[in-house]
Amino acid sequence: MAKVNVRDFIEEQYGLFINGEFQASESGDTLTVTNPANGEDLAKVAKASKSDVDKAVQAAQDAFDSWSKTSKEERADYLLEISRRIHEKVEHFATIESLQNGKPYRETSTIDVPLTANQFKYFASVLTTDEGSVNEIDENTMSLVVNEPVGVVGAVVAWNFPILLASWKLAPALAAGNTIVIQPSSSTPLSLIELAKIFQEVLPKGVVNVLTGKGSESGDAIFNHEGVNKLSFTGSTDVGYGVAKAGAERIVPTTLELGGKSANIIFDDANLDQVVEGAQLGILFNQGEVCSAGSRLLVQSSIYDKVMPKLKEAFENIKVGDPFDEDVKMSAQTGPEQLEKIESYVKIAEEDSNANILTGGHRLTDNGRDKGYFFEPTIIEIKDNSHQLAQEEIFGPVVVVEKFEDEAEAIKIANDSEYGLAGGIFTTNINRALNVAKAMRTGRIWINTYNQFPAGAPFGGYKKSGIGREIYKDAIKNYQQVKNIFIDTSNQTKGLY
């Protein structure tokens, strides 16, 4: 491991951030956060209980009255200041993200943290065009349409992009005038609790409350709390069912960004250099721990024998290791459970004659990697999209490859999934690209690239991949209610009674 002095970036212990103050949990219980690249302990964080959730929700409720009445200009200024401070501390937050998550510093410093800062900046600008409307129905009747904040938002985010996913909830929720109780994953909470230090300096007390704890305990308590008016969750589809149920039982609006098994389609006229890079972006970025990962690679049969040797060579040349090594392109999986899950799917391929492991398929333990959770970039060829490996989300650097003959077959295979989060198309034919994109039942399609997430491009899924869209101007509507004020100016009765 490249030498990083952990205590220059991370404290030994963190409390919960409630009502503008850091404090121990009521029980005094803590959780230990470890570095997945070397197994070393990083810090202890408070483990929130239901009573801590009660305190956080109460703080958010108390702050809502004044925060919701701040002007759009004031809220925009707050968001811009948060953005500025994150930009000033890119190295700080990127280092923490790499330490707790295992992803390469080259990604956290150029993607995760800058995009986080930009979310707050973007939604500050969205506020300038977030306007109501007036409709003069006739000479004596006027309809006013007013956008109002929902109230207290309860949010839980996954471990694969801890600080970035948090910004996808925080920025639009705050812009809309809501207060929020948010919890990161128990395995990767440090960047968000460090971000709370900026909230402490910038925002009024209680506007943002950050809890750390188990999703199955304090996370569930947030989603089932009577004082929470809006739910927002990013994570697995399995957990998403429970969040959706919690919202349905209380009739609370719910935004869900869930799993995927996205198809990355390669046509025979594609630029092969773009194809090789695009396939790697699709499945090796963030160690494949991406909900939108291009985990099904569909290659037109006429170029299959030309593409696969190039792809195999590219995967085998990926340097896997220390996240702070500048030459490393892929680092550690986030934890032992994820590594075991990946290994279990590779074992399925090993035991199935209908699957062929073209390259990879093993945990890496040499050259000092034995204490971390490293896995080889892996390519598995399959013959049928009904195969378990083509239908279930692996969430690692494992791509399954299938052949197709023409556009119609590519579309059929791509849509043969219970998920519909994303997909990719590589072709130089714009008509083909648009026709196939329109036919794919997914919320995001990349053409001649993959896994790009700039603010201003809506992201979210069809089918079991979720409800709602994020990182786009309309995402502010996820955190608003529409009020209609209907006015009769005639000063006369209607004569009906």
Curated annotation (Swiss-Prot):
Keywords: NAD, Oxidoreductase. The lineage of its organism: Bacteria, Bacillati, Bacillota, Bacilli, Bacillales. Belongs to the aldehyde dehydrogenase family. This is Putative aldehyde dehydrogenase AldA. Its EC number is 1.2.1.3. PROSITE patterns: ALDEHYDE_DEHYDR_CYS, ALDEHYDE_DEHYDR_GLU. It comes from Staphylococcus haemolyticus (strain JCSC1435). One of its GO terms (molecular function) is aldehyde dehydrogenase (NAD+) activity. Gene3D superfamilies: Aldehyde Dehydrogenase, Chain A, domain 1, Aldehyde Dehydrogenase, Chain A, domain 2. The active site is at 257, 291. The keyword Transmembrane helix does not apply.
